[in-house]
């Protein structure tokens, strides 16, 4: 059983939770917009671990991580959130408007397509059965709660079998492999990436 509540995103800088869901066997999962300055040290420690190699920021400095999330914070089409379980940070989640992202060059974007990225943070002690699925499920519930998302789109690295297994277990259907183009702009650089599309239709998506 789960219980949830959602609120509209707060003004930039307040960094209050925008979503809270009680997940049985996991705890209370909250999602809070990333504060690029305050959260950069934590995010940097996560994305530079070997286990996060598919996130693509393994060689990034803390300063670069802060700059990247400052850029995300300025955008209205891209958003980043820290997930907490009972107040403890456990994951980094990102959403984006597929029509306003490089992925739009790789497949036919439909109205209501929202892209997602997921990084579960390192666990303390023994791994908990169902933990990652519970946290990811809360995130998906949040994405669908605004009423405008008709389909959730994921594009994990094509080599990331673990991520694709998690997506399938969460109800996603795997699509074709794509080549995300390189982005080289003054404010952001993203290398080309071989990825695998995955889709999850929401209640409004049929």
Can you name each region flagged by the protein language model?
Residues 1-4, 18, 39-40, 89-206:
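Acyl-donor (CoA/ACP) binding surface of acyl/acetyltransferases
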Residues 1-37:
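Conserved N-terminal entry element of GNAT/NAT acetyltransferase domains
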Residues 27, 79, 91:
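Short beta-strand or tight-loop elements
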Residues 37-41, 51-52:
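Primarily extracytoplasmic ectodomains and periplasmic/lumenal surface modules that are beta-strand-rich
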Residues 45-59:
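Helix-loop element at the rim of GNAT/NAT acetyltransferase active sites that forms part
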Residues 59-80:
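Active-site rim helix/loop that mediates acceptor-substrate recognition in acyltransferases
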